[in-house]
A protein has these predicted regions:
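Beta-strand-loop-alpha-helix segment that lines the small-molecule cofactor/substrate pocket
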Residues: 1-27, 44
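A general structural signal for well-ordered alpha-helical segments in protein cores
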Residues: 8, 31-34, 86-87, 209-210, ...
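C-terminal helix-rich "cap/oligomerization" subdomain common to oxidoreductases
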Residues: 9-12, 17, 173-174, 212-256
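Short, well-ordered coil/turn segments that N-cap beta-strands
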Residues: 18-22, 48-50, 125-127
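Hydrophobic residues in well-ordered beta-strands that form the structural core
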Residues: 22-24, 53, 131, 173
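Rossmann-like NAD(P)H-binding beta-loop-alpha module
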Residues: 32-67
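NAD(P)-dinucleotide binding in Rossmann-like oxidoreductases
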Residues: 110-114, 124-208
Length: 256
C-alpha cells in the first residue's frame, strides 16, 4: 500500500476525503484455498481457534539479490517483501493482531536486512501464534511451494505452511487435512482423531484479482482489500520490525 506508515495514512485520508475506490494488490485475498479455510474455521469444525503455527521458509538464489541490490538494504528484507502477505492471510483467517514479539538475524547472508525471523503473535480474540520466516532456508514450507497457485514454483502437495488448532480439532493449510473429535466428551490425547481431507480449488488468484478490479472500476462492488486493510497489514509488519529491534512486546494499533 505504501513504503511507510506515514505515507499510508496520507493515502487513507485522501480516500476518505474523495470517496474514491482504491484496491490494494494483496492477491492472496482471492485465493480459493484461503476462502475454503476461512469458511471451515467459521463453521466451527475445529471448535474455537486457540493457536496457529505458520512458516514462510524458502531459499532465494544469489541472482535474486544481484538483480536488485535494494533487496539487501533497509525495506528490502523478507519481513516487508514476504511476511506482509502472510500477515494478510492470518488476519483473514483469525482476525486482528493485537501484539507481537520477534527476533531477527542476518547471520547467514550478512545483508543490512534480516534473512531469518521468528515471530510470536497475539490476536484480539485470544489466539496465540508463532511464525518462522527465512529466505535462506532450503525448505518447502512456504505458501508458494505448497499452494500450487503459481506454477512457476516447484510445489509439494503433501506439505503445509499453516496449522490452526482449535478446541475440537485442527486444520492444516493448504492440504485441508482436518483432525477432530466427533464427540466433545471424546476430547483427550488418549483418544484417536477422526481424520479427513476437504477438497478445494487451486486457482490462480491473480486472475480473480484482476476480475475483481474490473468490477470495482465498473462500480459493481467495493474493493476486497481496501487501503485500510493494506495499511493494517503494514502496521503489523512495522510492529514486528520494532519488536525485533527492541526485544520487547509491541502492541499493534488497530485502525478504526
Amino acid at each position: 500500500v505504501s513504503q511507510s506508515i506515514e505515507e499510508g495514512k496520507v493515502l487513507l485520508d485522501e480516500v476518505k476525503k474523495t470517496g474514491n475506490k482504491v484496491l490494494v494488490g494483496h492477491h492472496r485475498a482471492y485465493s480459493s484455498i484461503m476462502e475454503k479455510a476461512r469458511n471451515l474455521i467459521k463453521s466451527g469444525v475445529i471448535g474455537r481457534p486457540v493457536a496457529v503455527m505458520g512458516s514462510a521458509l524458502f531459499y532465494k538464489p544469489d541472482s535474486y539479490f544481484l538483480e536488485g541490490m535494494w533487496r539487501t538494504q533497509k525495506g528490502g528484507g523478507p519481513i516487508l517483501l514476504n511476511l506482509i502477505h502472510e500477515i494478510g492471510n492470518l488476519r483473514y483467517l483469525l482476525g486482528e493482531v493485537y501484539a507481537v514479539q520477534a527476533m531477527s538475524s542476518n547471520t547467514v547472508r550478512g545483508h543490512e536486512v534480516e534473512d531469518t525471523s521468528a515471530i510470536t503473535l497475539q490476536f484480539e480474540n485470544g489466539v496465540l501464534g508463532t511464525f518462522l520466516l527465512s529466505d535462506t532456508a532450503a525448505s518447502s514450507r512456504s505458501w508458494e511451494q505448497t499452494s500450487q497457485e503459481n506454477k512457476a514454483y516447484s510445489s509439494y502437495e503433501d506439505e503445509d505452511c499453516y496449522h490452526i488448532a482449535g478446541t475440537e480439532g485442527s486444520l492444516s493449510i493448504p492440504t485441508m487435512r482436518i483432525k477432530r473429535y466427533l464427540k466433545t466428551e471424546d476430547r483427550s490425547w488418549w483418544k484417536p482423531f477422526d481424520c479427513s481431507v476437504e477438497t478445494s480449488q487451486r486457482d490462480d488468484p491473480l486472475v480473480g484479482q484482476i476480475d475483481h478490479f474490473c468490477r470495482v472500476i465498473r462500480g459493481e462492488t467495493e474493493p476486497r482489500v481496501s487501503v485500510k486493510d493494506g495499511l493494517q497489514n503494514l502496521m503489523v509488519v512495522d510492529c514486528i520490525v520494532k519488536a525485533a529491534q527492541t526485544g520487547v512486546l509491541v502492541q499493534v494499533a488497530i485502525i478504526e
